C-alpha cells in the first residue's frame, strides 16, 4: 500500500516538472516586457515562477524558461491591443 502511494506521489511530481513552458511573458496590457539587460529578465522570469530568463537582443524582449503552464506567453509580436 505504501508503495502505491509512493508511486502516485512520484508520478505527480514528475508530471509537474514536465509541465513547464518557455516564451515571451506579457503584462496586463498584452505587451511583452521590453529589456536591455539579461539580469532584469532573469529576475522577472523568476518572479513569474520560471527557472531563468534573458533579454533577447534582436527584439529587446524578455524570454523565459521553465514557466508554469498558467503563465501567459506570446510567441511573436511585441505588443497586442486588447480590442
UniProtKB/Swiss-Prot annotation:
Signal peptide: 1-19
Pfam family, one: Toxin_3
BP GO annotations: defense response
Role of this protein: Binds voltage-independently at site-3 of voltage-gated sodium channels (Nav) and inhibits the inactivation of the activated channels, thereby blocking neuronal transmission.
Gene Ontology cellular-component annotations: extracellular region
Family that this chain belongs to: Belongs to the long (4 C-C) scorpion toxin superfamily. Sodium channel inhibitor family. Alpha subfamily.
Keywords linked to the UniProt accession: Disulfide bond, Ion channel impairing toxin, Neurotoxin, Secreted, Signal, Toxin, Voltage-gated sodium channel impairing toxin
Disulfide bond positions: 31-79, 35-55, 41-62, 45-64
Gene3D superfamilies: Knottin, scorpion toxin-like
Superkingdom field: Eukaryota
First-listed, main subcellular location of the protein, grouped into a coarse class: secreted
Tissue-by-tissue expression: Expressed by the venom gland.
Name of the featured protein: Neurotoxin LmNaTx10
UniProt cross-references to InterPro entries, sorted A to Z: LCN-type_CS_alpha_beta_dom, Scorpion_toxin-like, Scorpion_toxin-like_sf, Scorpion_toxinL, Scorpion_toxinL/defensin
Subcellular location: Secreted
Limits of the LCN-type CS-alpha/beta domain: 21-80
Keyword ATP-binding assigned: no
Domain notes: Has the structural arrangement of an alpha-helix connected to antiparallel beta-sheets by disulfide bonds (CS-alpha/beta).
Molecular functions per Gene Ontology: sodium channel inhibitor activity; toxin activity
